[in-house]
Design a protein with these regions (language model features):
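Conserved alpha/beta catalytic core and glycan-binding cleft of carbohydrate-active enzymes
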Residues: 1-117, 123, 155-173
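Short, helix-capping/interhelical loops that line the mouth of catalytic, cofactor-
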Residues: 119-131
């Protein structure tokens, strides 16, 4: 199983309290040390029509109604926190590089659907709403700011991708 499939399986099949650190560690580091890999939390096909992104699986329809900065909704707060954790764990256990698909870094709420016969060649969803992350009244900028800080942290360590991964401790309770 690859990392994006693992995160989807966790979200769909496990309660938060059943997310075991040892399992997360294994899935995000299970590779040959001498082979460079590109790690990513979600794949491009999860954002295509017919599937859901990680953030949408975590927040679902509350994303359309509760993303105002001053709206305190449990599902949204939980989803944002888990989204950040998933991305941080994935990005910091790389063995070569980290990849993000456009818009996923700030939790874009819609799928991508390129013009095709099945949608009457529409361009309606062949876009990303970049204004969402720039709107300081919405929570999307929290995710965008986190992603920016995370990448800055990783870049601050010279040759980060070559840093040996060391499991210090886990407790599956």
């Amino acid at each position: 199983m690859n990392i994006p499939d693992y995160w989807i399986k966790m979200i769909k099949e496990k309660k938060d309290e059943d997310w075991h650190p040892s399992s997360i560690w294994w899935e995000t580091t299970n590779r040959r040390a001498d082979e460079k890999t590109i790690s990513y939390a979600e794949s491009h096909d999860q954002a295509l029509v017919g599937d859901k992104t990680i953030i949408f699986r975590l927040i679902d329809a509350d994303m359309y109604w509760h993303m105002q900065k001053d709206d305190h909704n449990f599902m949204v707060e939980r989803g944002i926190a888990l989204h950040k954790m998933i991305r941080l764990v994935t990005a910091t256990t790389i063995n070569g590089g980290y990849l993000n698909f456009m818009g996923n870094e700030f939790g874009h709420p819609e799928w991508i659907d390129f013009p095709r016969e099945g949608n009457d060649w529409s361009y309606k969803y062949a876009r990303r709403q970049w204004d969402l992350v720039d709107n300081m009244d919405l929570k999307y900028h929290f995710l965008g700011d986190f992603d920016e800080a995370m990448i800055k942290l990783i870049r601050s360590v010279r040759n980060f991708q070559a840093t040996p991964l060391l499991k210090v401790w886990d407790n599956d309770g």
